[in-house]
From Swiss-Prot:
It is a single-pass membrane protein. Glycans are attached at N46, N91, N100, N120, N212, N354, N400, N429. This is Envelope glycoprotein C homolog. GO terms for cellular component: extracellular region; host cell plasma membrane; membrane. Keywords: Glycoprotein, Host cell membrane, Host membrane, Host-virus interaction, Immunoglobulin domain, Membrane, Secreted, Signal, Transmembrane, Transmembrane helix. The lineage of its organism: Viruses, Duplodnaviria, Heunggongvirae, Peploviricota, Herviviricetes.
Length: 501
């Protein structure tokens, strides 16, 4: 029984000298400090991983007292002694203790499973290493890895609700459809001399970590969070063969309340359905917003065959959601008050807001275009007072100085509407000319209300009356010419006779 213990002790002695050798990475900067404070705080190192040594955790005592319920804190105080024989004896005793406790499994307990943190603020969580007993040799055989994993957002852009239920969000091709990769934030070790070591960090001072050596607790801060920090942290304990023993997930939920909510209810023509859109701008994450509709205070339900929702992501601003709804016939009732109620929810946090709009209803005007007495005349009935007339000849707008528009009276069927008459001289240019009377001022397409007719001034269109007129004029001219000639001949003959006499 003595021989195995001696061999084991000699093995630990060899390991000890190996750690202290100048060629070893850990021992290169190792200094034995028996007065190490129980609280350590550090930022993960930003040194290069390639061939560079690990960084020793600086001794920075915390100014705040940390109270925990860690079991048997005072029972596991490590006493370091000098001299080779004392070190061998200490490790031999520890080895024996480990052999008696191999059936006990270590554990990691964290104070939360989800960290809800608002944009540009700091998120925190604390994890405690439960090892009984947490001896130096066991600590040196454990590695704590802190790994960030993003939550990707790929989704059906037309149905946010279904995507939210399925846990999938995003519009393929958006700048957040492909987030940052999973990466190791920090790898923490403790050697038999009680010194903690950390691996390089990919983000400098983005992450802040502190350790309570007495209670075996680790705190993590994620500073100035942005959308790319939305994901989950893995706290993994590995053995000396790099095999994972425990894997804890702490979700980092980045939050942003909606910046604004607006309802757009475009104007409609009498007889058409009302339509409205609710725009929820700059919130996070996608799927955290719930939209409901009210019509005059009553619940209105969107129809799946014609209504829906879609959203997009703007870098640095968050997600924007648009929800649409179609309501009843505008020719039956007065314009309703359409309200959009928005609830943003993350964890136990709820924020609500609403917006309202009343659409405007326009009635179809009546137009007629005719030609009379050398004018193109447009008769308009039942238009609002802000509506004006524009004439076009061959689809080219004419200056308003070339035509005249007057109010002829009030509309008898629609309140606050009036009747108009507008006319423009036709071109008597022996060609076929297109005239268009267009109403300006409606919030629809410019050519929504207009009437067009052709004025045909060609000879063929003028017909028999014109031919008769021309013939009569020519005949009269011939008769007059002949009369003049005969009169001249008579005068000539009379004058000649008088001369002979």
């Amino acid at each position: 029984m003595l021989t195995p213990r001696v061999l084991r002790a000699l093995g630990w002695t060899g390991l000890f000298f190996l750690l202290l050798s100048p060629s070893n990475v850990l021992g290169a900067s190792l200094s034995r400090d028996l007065e190490t404070p129980p609280f350590l705080s550090f930022d993960p190192s930003n040194i290069s991983i390639n061939g560079a040594p690990l960084t020793e955790v600086p001794h920075a005592p915390s100014t705040e007292s940390v109270s925990t319920n860690s079991e048997s804190t005072n029972e596991h105080t490590i006493t370091e002694t000098t001299g080779k024989n004392a070190y061998i004896h200490n490790n031999a005793s520890t080895d024996k203790q480990n052999a008696n406790d191999t059936h006990k499994t270590p554990n990691i307990l964290c104070d939360t499973e989800e960290v809800f943190v608002f944009l540009n603020e700091t998120g925190r969580f604390v994890c405690t290493l439960k090892v009984d007993p947490p001896s130096d040799s066991e600590w040196s055989n454990f590695v704590l890895d802190l790994i960030f994993n993003p939550i990707e957002y790929h989704a059906n852009e037309k149905n946010v609700e279904a995507a939210r239920i399925a846990g999938l969000y995003g519009v393929p091709g958006s700048d957040y459809a492909y987030p940052r990769q999973s990466e190791l934030i920090s790898s923490i070790r403790r050697d038999p001399q009680g010194t903690f070591w950390t691996s390089p960090s990919p983000h400098g001072n983005k992450y802040f970590i502190w350790i309570n050596k007495t209670t075996n607790t680790m705190g993590v801060e994620i500073r100035n969070v942005d959308y790319a920090d939305n994901g989950y942290m893995q706290v993994i304990m590995r053995d000396h063969f790099n095999r994972p023993l425990i894997d804890k997930h702490i979700y980092i939920r980045v939050c942003q309340r909606p910046a604004s909510v607006d309802v757009l209810a475009p104007p409609v023509l009498s007889g058409e359905n009302y339509k409205a859109s609710c725009i929820v701008r700059h919130f996070y994450p996608p799927g955290s917003v719930y939209v409901s509709w009210r019509q005059n205070g009553n619940i209105a339900t969107p129809r799946k065959d014609r209504d829906g929702s879609f959203w997009w992501f703007e870098s640095g601003r968050g997600a924007t959601l648009v929800s649409t709804i179609t309501l009843g016939n505008s020719g039956i009732d007065f314009p309703p008050k359409i309200s959009c109620l928005v609830a943003w929810k993350q964890g136990d946090m709820i924020s609500t807001t609403n917006a309202t709009a009343i659409p405007t209803v326009y009635h179809h005007p009546r137009l007629s275009l005719a030609f009379k007495d050398g004018y193109a005349i447009c008769t308009i009935e039942c238009v609002p007072s802000e509506i004006t007339v524009r004439w076009l000849v061959h689809d080219e707008a004419q200056p308003n100085t070339t035509y005249n528009t007057v109010v002829t009276g009030l509309c008898r069927t629609i309140d606050r509407h009036r009747n108009l008459l507008s006319r423009i001289p036709v071109w008597d240019n022996w060609t076929k000319t297109k005239y268009t009377c267009r109403l300006i001022g409606y919030p629809f397409d410019e050519d929504k209300f207009q009437d067009s007719e052709y004025y045909d001034a060609t000879p063929a269109a003028r017909g028999t009356p014109m031919v008769i007129t021309v013939t009569a004029v020519l005949g009269l001219a011939v008769i007059l010419g002949m009369g003049i000639i005969m009169t001249a001949l008579c005068l000539y003959n009379s004058t000649r006779k008088n001369i002979r006499l």
